[in-house]
């Protein structure tokens, strides 16, 4: 195969990041994509900051002691952000207690609330966490039913207005409380609306994210991180590259969070994460990563750090 010709025919093969026009320098020289800086507590990401590593607690977020203990283990292992699942208002409100306990011990590591299905929970979490993750697939759209729905252009536009009506007040809360936002798309939870128009495709995954990013841009809300995750590493890599290219064409430079869902445990989980995350890091894409393993959360940190160090050591190498 003529690699040069193949690359030139595929505009998303590199998305203009981490390689030159002939597609070869990215194999030997790391060059990171430019992204604007996002403030997440006292640990900003993007810009000239190092690639941040993070993990996620597995303890019930309503259990303050368990969450604090596990967060400390993640932080002691080198985690720079700690994410906590936030299923309901009770869990969102308890983020305050977890945050206070850690700060009392002199720990300032930012906490990230992971919210699904309930916009009101995101509003509450934004009061107490340094960053809130929302999933476009279920933020306003109902839970996926796998039904084929038909929308006229007018009906589709009305659905987008519903998202904006709910999302803009959330952004205003985040702006007031200096809370960052992650727009985190999961391949497995695309809405029926997106699926009906775009199918189960990278284009649909990207559009699910872009709908929210366009609102952020209109509202001049810059403290946004984005992610696209899939258990299939090929789908993940293709979708993220397409997202980067789409943002470039729409003059956006939001930083990216990288991760592979359901990576597993042991050697298999590490290899799967290295394939998906490593390919994108080699492209110069990625400002924070989480290696998702079916193990204790602190076990994820050394793997993530090794992956980042391996790729970034190539900077300036010729």
Task: Indicate residue ranges for each PLM-predicted region.
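Active-site mouth loops of central-metabolism enzymes
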Residues: 31, 40, 47-66, 85-87, ...
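Glycine-rich, proline-tolerant flexible connector loops at the mouths of alpha/beta enzymes
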Residues: 58, 78-102, 136-158, 224-233
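Non-cysteine beta-strand/loop elements that form the S-adenosyl-L-methionine
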Residues: 131-138, 180-188, 256
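Catalytic alpha/beta core domains of metabolic enzymes, predominantly
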Residues: 150-167, 172, 195-318
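N-terminal amphipathic alpha-helix/helix-capping segment at the start of soluble metabolic enzymes
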Residues: 2-55, 171, 175-177, 313-318
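Glycine-rich phosphate-binding active-site loops on the catalytic face of alpha/beta enzymes
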Residues: 78-83, 128-145, 282-298
């Amino acid at each position: 195969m003529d690699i040069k010709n193949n690359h030139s025919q595929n505009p998303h093969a590199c998305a203009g990041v981490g390689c030159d026009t002939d597609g070869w320098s990215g194999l030997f020289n790391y060059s990171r994509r430019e992204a604007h800086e996002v403030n997440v507590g006292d640990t900003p990401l993007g810009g000239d900051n190092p690639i941040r590593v993070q993990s996620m607690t597995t303890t019930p977020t309503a259990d303050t002691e368990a969450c604090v203990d596990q967060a400390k283990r993640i932080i002691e292992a080198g985690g720079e952000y700690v994410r906590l699942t936030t299923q309901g208002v009770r869990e969102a409100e308890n983020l305050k207690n977890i945050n206070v306990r850690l700060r009392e011990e002199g720990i300032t590591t930012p906490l990230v609330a992971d919210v699904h299905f309930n916009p009101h929970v995101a509003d509450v979490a934004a009061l107490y966490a340094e960053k809130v993750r929302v999933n476009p697939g279920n933020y306003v759209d109902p839970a996926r039913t796998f039904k084929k729905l038909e929308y006229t252009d007018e009906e589709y536009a009305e659905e987008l207005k519903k998202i904006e009506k709910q999302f803009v007040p959330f952004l205003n809360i985040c702006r007031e409380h200096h809370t960052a936002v992650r727009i985190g798309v999961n391949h497995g939870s695309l809405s029926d609306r997106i699926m009906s128009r775009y199918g189960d495709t990278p284009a649909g995954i990207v559009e699910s994210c872009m709908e929210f990013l366009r609102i952020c841009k209109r509202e001049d809300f810059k403290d946004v991180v984005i992610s696209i995750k899939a258990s299939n590493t090929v789908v993940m890599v293709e979708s993220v590259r397409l997202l980067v290219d789409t943002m470039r064409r729409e003059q956006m430079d939001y930083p990216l969070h990288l991760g592979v869902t359901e990576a597993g445990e042991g050697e298999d989980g590490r290899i799967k994460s290295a394939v998906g995350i490593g390919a994108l890091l080699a492209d110069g894409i990625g400002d924070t990563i989480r290696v998702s393993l079916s193990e204790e959360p602190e076990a994820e940190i050394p793997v993530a750090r090794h992956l980042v160090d391996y790729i970034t050591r190539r900077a300036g190498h010729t």
